[in-house]
Curated annotation (Swiss-Prot):
Every SCP domain range: 37-165
Quaternary assembly: Interacts with PSP94/MSMB.
Entry comment on modification after translation: N- and O-glycosylated. O-glycosylated with core 1 or possibly core 8 glycans.
Domain of life: Eukaryota
Main location: secreted
Assigned protein family: Belongs to the CRISP family.
Keyword Secreted listed: yes
Cleaved signal peptide residues: 1-27
Protein's recorded name: Peptidase inhibitor 16
Compartment(s) where it occurs, according to its Swiss-Prot or TrEMBL record: Secreted
InterPro entries assigned to the protein according to its UniProt record, in alphabetical order: Allrgn_V5/Tpx1_CS (IPR018244), CAP_dom (IPR014044), CAP_sf (IPR035940), CRISP-related (IPR001283)
Membrane spanning stretches: none
This protein's UniProt keywords: Glycoprotein, Protease inhibitor, Secreted, Signal
Length: 463
């Protein structure tokens, strides 16, 4: 009996772990947060034409908490109480959030946007794209939540993603950024890094600062000239690839904590006159050469960037498309993937959207609105579609938003994208749905699996 109790005590943590790991997922992981910021900055650095005033974007926990709180409400529509915050929405009926897919959905709208005229093609959405590349926006915070029922959408079991931005973008009549040489118009107090304007003294700069390293017990002395010992062993560090060392010449070396440099692939080592070391256990170098680490970070403008792999095929598409996806690694947004079938939705503005657009047109010019609410009647400008779709394409009208069931059969995962806007500027919010083959409400099977496994495990412990 004692053995059975011990066995059950061992099984209990395993059962709790099983239920915890297979339950509904809804919060963004640290990796997904990092990926969201990285993809925003990659897209911002690679805009064409190049931007002269594009700010580096960073994560903001307050915005993330605000976005998460709204995501918990499970509403497919923009937050009316978001104040002076920009907002992008994305939803997917699949097992967890797909950050690269969400970013590509938003960024693909660039082919409908005319930068010179600051207009969007009639019937298209550009608000996601313009918010992503809005030069003055430099803070982002996102939150996701699993919704068994998303208000405004007939589909069930949906993962909703909300991203908020500060300062907000999508100002009526204004371009997202100024064309020109990258970083040529950075604000005062900013410097250029990877074609983006980054604040001087930001946390990202910490790894670029040199550190004084006088203790290196893990390295062997390979050369010593005119060095003196004063009670402690001394050595000449001839190669320290993991550290950055400032010049120490003819001065006493004091003990300092070694600083680890995460990116220092190359270094130039020079010899300096020997320096005296006072007593400092366990080991103090008496001659420390100056090592200048030359960072060789790849430029975002020199070659195409391959984005992190996704469990889906992130085929960039307009915000009112339906595209099948399979389990294939993600590729660069500049490459198209075939052979997919896309259904292009209706291009007409919905009646309620037209009424809102007319009402918004009466506001002062300084009001911030979504660019695509007022589509231009002239032809699309210089930004052309760079992606080739080789699948069979047919047209199909959406009966009315937010009913998305008419755009695809409920046979797999779907993604919904709602354009970015500011309060009072909601436009033709037509969702896009992405169908998949091996998706589904995986959150249902987790608890059931735990319940099915519980009786056999208990019986095994008793007998």
């Amino acid at each position: 009996m004692h053995g059975s109790c011990s066995f059950l005590m061992l099984l209990l943590p395993l059962l709790l772990l099983l239920v915890a790991t297979t339950g509904p997922v809804g919060a963004l992981t640290d990796e997904e947060k990092r990926l969201m910021v990285e993809l925003h900055n990659l897209y911002r650095a690679q805009v064409s034409p190049t931007a002269s005033d594009m700010l580096h974007m960073r994560w903001d926990e307050e915005l993330a908490a605000f976005a998460k709180a709204y995501a918990r409400q499970c509403v497919w529509g923009h937050n009316k109480e978001r104040g002076r915050r920009g907002e992008n929405l994305f939803a997917i009926t699949d097992e967890g959030m797909d950050v690269p897919l969400a970013m590509e959905e938003w960024h693909h709208e660039r082919e409908h946007y005319n930068l010179s005229a600051a207009t969007c093609s009639p019937g298209q959405m550009c608000g996601h794209y313009t918010q992503v590349v809005w030069a003055k926006t430099e803070r982002i915070g996102c939150g996701s939540h699993f919704c068994e029922k998303l208000q405004g959408v007939e589909e069930t079991n949906i993962e909703l993603l909300v991203c908020n931005y500060e300062p907000p973008g999508n100002v009526k009549g204004k371009r997202p950024y100024q064309e020109g040489t990258p970083c040529s118009q950075c604000p005062s107090g900013y410097h250029c890094k990877n074609s983006l304007c980054e604040p001087i003294g930001s946390p990202e700069d910490a790894q670029d600062l040199p550190y004084l390293v006088t203790e290196a017990p893990s390295f062997r002395a390979t050369e010593a000239s005119d060095s003196r010992k004063m009670g402690t062993p001394s050595s000449l560090a001839t190669g320290i690839p993991a550290f950055l060392v400032t010049e120490v010449s003819g001065s006493l070396a004091t003990k300092a904590l070694p600083a680890v440099e995460t990116q220092a692939p190359t270094s130039l080592a020079t010899k300096d006159p020997p320096s005296m070391a006072t007593e400092a256990p366990p080991c103090v170098t008496t001659e420390v050469p100056s090592i200048l680490a030359a960072h060789s970070l790849p430029s975002l403008d020199e070659e195409p960037v391959t984005f992190p792999k996704s469990t889906h095929v992130p085929i960039p598409k307009s915000a009112d498309k339906v595209t099948d996806k399979t389990k294939v690694p993600s590729r660069s947004p500049e490459n198209s993937l075939d052979p997919k079938m896309s259904l292009t939705g209706a291009r007409e503005l919905l009646p309620h959207a037209q009424e809102e657009a007319e009402a918004e047109a009466e506001l002062p010019p300084s009001s911030e609105v979504l660019a695509s609410v007022f589509p231009a009647q002239d032809k699309p400008g210089e930004l052309q579609a760079t992606l080739d779709h080789t699948g069979h394409t047919s047209s199909k009208s959406l009966p009315n938003f937010p009913n998305t069931s008419a755009t695809a059969n409920a046979t797999g995962g779907r993604a919904l994208a709602l354009q970015s806007s500011l309060p009072g500027a909601e436009g033709p919010d037509k969702p896009s749905v992405v169908s998949g083959l091996n998706s589904g409400p995986g959150h249902v099977w987790g608890p059931l699996l735990g319940l099915l496994l519980l009786p056999p495990l208990v019986l095994a412990g008793i007998f």
